[in-house]
Design a protein with these regions (language model features):
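Flexible glycine/proline-rich, aromatic-decorated loop/lid segments
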Residues: 307-311, 320-330, 355-375, 453-478, ...
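PLP-dependent aminotransferase-like
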Residues: 214-269
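Active-site C-terminal subdomain of aminotransferase-like
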Residues: 315-438, 442-448
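Non-catalytic terminal extensions of PLP-dependent enzymes
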Residues: 2-170, 174-178, 182-183, 406, ...
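Active-site nucleophile and cofactor-binding loops and adjacent substrate-binding regions
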Residues: 24-27, 168-169, 192-199, 226-228
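Conserved beta-loop-alpha segment that forms the PLP phosphate-binding cup at the N-terminus of a helix
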Residues: 173-178, 190-219, 232-237
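Helix C-cap/helix->beta junction micro-motif
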Residues: 241, 297-298, 459
Length: 579
């Protein structure tokens, strides 16, 4: 029946083609056919690349525009000024001290070196030991530092690359992984490795799933789907490993992953779905149960990025705060990344990547069987790894104990809720979403929030400016009363709201440093005083360095913004050429 329906159309098509080619010689027909097929394949590949045709078109247009001499000179002139600004900042922070650019002929003494280190560590404008910094340093205690110094002294030259020589360090790493897996309700088959930080943990997870999908499902063009609020380490993994990263929007009121958007983005090449607990920009938690359900429905692994708040969320229930399920207790969650060097309070350079089953971890490993030097295998990016850092991480966890972590979590979350509540009471401010753990994203509808960040910097505070809010709509507290704590009335109706200001944000990442010595009260008081001053002229625009940061978000040619960033990174390695 079906074939008879298409038969007349096919006959017409056949007659048409035969008529067009009736006067062609066989070699011409073969040439036309081959050329048409090759052109079709090329056109398909050109249109359906990892990067959209529109995005590539914009980049090409901007790249060609930058080749116009007048435009190129103007852009290069401005970039040179920015580069010079970054270098001057580094020079100023160095406080006029000379650089060591060649190895000294005679080595310096122990005393000289220690004094130099003390001098170097005094550079900088922010008193992080007194809690003036958002994130960065999550715990500081002289007794713990003494313990870690002793431990690192003992293990400083150890390397788990040589398990026969340093089996004790390998045992410590295995114990860190198992302790962490148990905290995240991993079963007997759960496993993992330590890494040097959250970025490497995420890189390893992406590499593992890429190789797993290639081996088990034959996927050659892998894609990972994640909310736009996910950490840029996933984008780095995409660049490193040739994985297409598909960003999906978040709910513009609660700032959680839009599950329907993630569902629509799934394709036959999807190898991983990602959720955060919490995300960095807003401090809100994605609905891991819903993401995991999506993963089960389509047989796609699910990664939970708990790098930022992992060592808070696992203790929050015991600290008296209920959270939705987010770990291996949720069916469908196949991996979790968590930083021990953040709220695990270990020294910098340690994180953990966990898997629900060894089959995923096996694809994280790199194995070379035909090297003349022998069979080579390494669990993470690095071959040699610092055994001293592994030992220090192990010592931190064993020293704190469960009770210590629960107590620290309770203090941090209590402080976060206090700051959140008090900031909502300030005329002209609002909070994005509902902070799940320790991150508070602050905005204003009546003045540019970067002005507050700049003002607080003059008082010694260091906050994080953020960019690109989700969606075109701005938070409306009256339509989302659940975002406002009980008894707190938003005061935004008392002032003129200026469209666009609510799209800018800064955030405070509360650490253990903010729970002591009245730090939270000092922060709130400084915010109240500076907002009162700003409200005298709320329409004034931001200036200084933050103005440049804000301006960069409006530049359509993102390659120029990339140049800004590269110059900033270059400045970190500045040394004088005339010394």
């Amino acid at each position: 029946m079906t074939s008879s329906l298409f038969k007349p159309g096919f006959e017409h098509f056949k007659i048409f083609v035969n008529g067009c080619l009736c006067d062609k010689e066989p070699w011409q027909i073969v040439t036309l056919t081959t050329t048409s097929v090759l052109a079709g394949v090329w056109l398909w590949g050109f249109i359906f690349q990892e990067e959209s045709l529109l995005s590539r078109g914009k980049k090409t247009a901007f790249r060609l525009a930058r080749k116009i001499p007048a435009i190129a000179r103007r852009i290069d002139s401005e970039l040179d000024k920015i580069n010079e600004t970054f270098e001057k900042e580094v020079i100023n922070r160095n406080q006029g001290n000379p650089y060591i650019t060649t190895i000294p002929d005679k080595g310096k003494s122990h005393t000289e070196i220690v004094e130099l280190v003390k001098q170097y560590l005094k550079f900088g404008d922010f008193k992080w030991e007194e809690g003036y910094v958002s994130g960065a340093v999550y715990y500081f205690n002289t007794d713990l530092i003494k313990l870690l110094t002793d431990v690192y002294t003992l293990a400083s030259y150890t390397n788990p690359l040589h398990p026969d020589i340093f089996p004790g360090v390998c045992k410590m790493e295995a114990e860190v992984v198992r302790m962490t897996a148990n905290l995240f309700h991993g079963g007997p088959s759960s496993c993992g490795t330590m890494t040097t930080g959250g970025t490497e943990s995420i890189l390893m997870a992406c590499k593992a799933y890429r190789d797993y999908a290639r081996s088990e499902w034959g996927i050659k063009h892998p894609e990972i789907i994640l909310p736009t609020t996910s950490h840029p380490a996933f984008d780095k993994a995409g660049l490193y490993f040739g994985i297409r990263i598909t960003h999906t929007p978040v709910d513009p009121v609660h700032y959680k992953a839009d599950i329907n958007a993630m569902r629509r983005a799934i394709s036959r090449n999807t190898i991983l779905l990602v959720g955060s607990t919490p995300n960095f920009p807003y401090g809100t938690m994605d609905d891991i149960e819903e993401i995991a359900a999506l993963g089960r429905q389509y047989n796609i692994p699910v990664h939970v990025d708990a790098c930022l708040g992992g060592f808070l969320v696992i203790f929050m229930e015991q600290a008296g705060y209920k959270l939705p399920p987010f770990d291996f207790s949720v069916p469908g969650v196949t991996s979790i990344s968590a930083d021990t060097h953040k709220y695990g309070f270990a020294p910098k350079g340690s994180s953990v990547i966990l898997y629900s089953e060894p089959k995923y971890r096996h694809h994280q490993f790199c194995v070379t069987t035909d090297w003349p030097g022998g069979v080579y295998g390494s669990p993470t990016v690095n071959g040699s790894r610092a055994g001293g850092i592994i030992a220090a991480c192990w010592a931190t966890m064993v020293s704190f104990g469960l009770n210590g972590y629960v107590d620290a979590t309770k203090k941090i979350v209590e402080t976060t809720k206090l700051i959140d509540k008090r900031l909502r009471e300030i005329d002209g401010l609002f909070i994005f979403g509902s902070p799940a753990t320790s991150v508070i994203a602050i905005g204003s509808k009546v003045f540019h929030i970067y002005r507050l960040s700049d003002a607080l910097t003059t008082r010694g505070w260091n906050l994080n400016p953020l960019q690109y809010p989700e969606g075109s709509s701005t938070p409306t507290l009256s339509s989302a009363p659940d975002l406002v704590p009980a008894g707190v009335q938003p005061n935004l109706h008392q002032v003129t709201q200026i469209p666009g200001y609510a799209t800018w944000r800064i955030h405070l990442c509360v650490t253990y440093m903010h729970t002591t010595n009245g730090v939270a009260d000092r922060f709130i008081a400084d915010v109240e005083e500076e907002v009162a001053l700003i409200m005298k002229d709320p329409s004034k625009e931001v200036d200084g360095k933050l103005a440049m940061y804000g301006m960069s978000q409006k530049i359509p040619d993102r390659s120029i913004v990339g140049d800004f960033t590269r110059f900033f990174l270059d400045s970190m390695y500045y040394t004088p050429t005339d010394q």
